Amino acid sequence: MNAARPSTEHCDLLVIGSGAGALSAAVTAAHLGLKVIVVEKDPQYGGTTAWSGGWMWVPRNPLAIEAGLVERIEKPLSYLRRELGEKFDESRVLAFLKNGPRMVEFFRRHTALQFIDGNVIPDFHGHTIDAALGGRSICAAPFDARQLGDRLHDLKPPLQETTLWGMGIASGAELRHFLNALHKPASFWHVTKLVLRHGRDLLVHRRGTRLVNGNALIGGLAQSAFALGVQIRVNSPAVRLLQSEGRVTGAVVQTPNGEVSIQARCGVVLASGGFPHDPARKQQLLPHAPTGHEHWSAGNRGNTGDGLRLGESAGGVVAGDLVQAAALAPVSLVLRPDGSVAHFPHLIERAKPGLIA
């Protein structure tokens, strides 16, 4: 007996993945009037972004300019030229530097996603010529997840080990309040209010609704997507791309109810994350990891390189000449009460004096 032919659906744009890149593409396309479907293989949307700090490096962004931190484009261009060395591509870098601020303004003006500034956060390599002492970073502002309604519980919660009883703590000023809660009355009162609200959220919603960091970034994007009619489907991995006459026309998606063929008139966006949990790809691209099992990643466990393989199936080529194919940080393995093992990233610790890693 022949296997049943997948049912067929149609849209203008199909987005594979549901992190910040995926949802940014979905929201932008929907704002321009396209019918968009987002498919996510995990049971919850948000990807690694939902676990992240939610920070973005966007020189000359509107928040910095509003604070009086104005610089010519040549400054960050020079910084990146020195940082990237022989991999510097001026056309790409200029495209990023020119369109990054436009992106921030678009989301501020047209979506639920808002931002807080990082005007006192310096560039990573402060001794590089044309590095800045601040004004080049932004972060998602706290977001009230009650706006998500019945899709709240489809949002991936923050990594448990980075929270206080499941409550996310925003980096920057809020984190300083928590560190000073037993020393400064203002900090104690600030923390008390947040803890009381979180307790109420647990009673009413079974999870926190004041989202911060990467969770806020996903919350704001998801709310905007839903408001624009974007469909976000979880438990729906893309298994292969559809092609016709040399172009990608859609994808076959495995859903809880069987395979669905989604035809996308304008194309497919591959935004399903990297390859931190793909040993074969790590073995190929990380010379110091000869078996592909030398590193533990704090990235989403669903990041197994699916998008790269899908791209290769359509003739794409994954660059193999990168100076460094991974962003590395110390990770601890934390045994949870249920027997599972969490991968805890020591991101803050990287900046502490005396760290050896």
Please identify what each model-predicted range represents.
Residues 62-64, 68, 76-88, 95:
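Eukaryotic low-complexity, mixed-charge intrinsically disordered interaction/regulatory segments enriched
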Residues 1-76, 115-357:
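Residues forming the flavin
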Residues 83-123:
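Long, well-ordered early-domain segments
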Residues 78-82, 95-98, 109, 177, ...:
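Charged/polar, solvent-exposed surface patches and flexible loops
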Residues 81-90, 201-208:
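Short glycine/proline- and acidic residue-enriched helix-loop micro-motifs
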